[in-house]
Regions:
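N-terminal beta-strand motif that seeds the catalytic metal site of vicinal oxygen chelate
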Residues: 1-23, 84-85, 89, 142-156
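Core segments of cupin and vicinal oxygen chelate
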Residues: 18-64
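Helix-adjacent hinge/juxtasegments
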Residues: 60, 65-90
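Short glycine-/small-residue motifs
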Residues: 54, 135-138
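Conserved beta-strand edge residues that scaffold enzyme active sites
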Residues: 43-44, 114-116, 142, 147
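Vicinal oxygen chelate
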Residues: 20-23, 80, 84-132
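Short beta->alpha transition motifs characteristic of CBS
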Residues: 121, 138-145
């Protein structure tokens, strides 16, 4: 490693979204996306996603003060306005997800077909919103080719 070079990061462990109504958010993330909470209370619900990370749903304003825990402290954080979060899905699952969202009245606001510099099809993304206006994305493999892994975490 070069002098003053940063050590390697192992991945993104958590992504946080901030919501106004925790019950409404849980109904969406559990009922529409099928996520199962690993922890939940009035302040925070945490969902495992893909076996490699967690989606944290905080009630807006609930984390804007220092949290004092037995093992230390967590600095304040919060977010306002629509935030973007993308989920990876299998290419053959895209039509099923589109039908599932439509059946539940969740509007797909956009669709992008990603292409390589040569024009070859690479990936497809669809975009929709949660009840708090956060922009969510389902992306098929190939959007970020260096990041494609199978369901077991093996590089494809």
């Amino acid at each position: 490693m070069a002098p003053n070079a940063a050590p390697a990061l192992a991945g993104v462990l958590e992504t946080a979204l901030y919501v106004d109504d925790m019950e409404r958010a849980r109904a969406f993330y559990e009922g529409v996306l099928g996520l199962e909470p690993m922890f939940g209370d009035a302040r925070l619900t945490a969902y495992p996603v893909g076996g490699r990370g967690a989606l944290l749903i905080f009630r807006r304003g609930a984390a804007n003060h220092t949290a004092h825990l037995p093992g230390g402290t967590i600095p304040p954080h919060d977010g306002s306005g629509p935030i973007h979060c993308a989920f990876s899905i299998a290419a053959d699952a895209l039509p099923t997800w589109e039908a599932h969202l439509a059946a539940l009245g969740v509007a797909v606001e956009g669709r992008t077909e990603w292409r390589s510099s040569s024009g070859a099809a690479r990936s497809v993304s669809i975009y929709f919103r949660d009840p708090d206006g956060h922009l969510l994305e389902f992306a098929t493999p190939g959007l970020w080719p260096r990041l494609d892994f199978d369901q077991h975490g093996a590089k494809t």
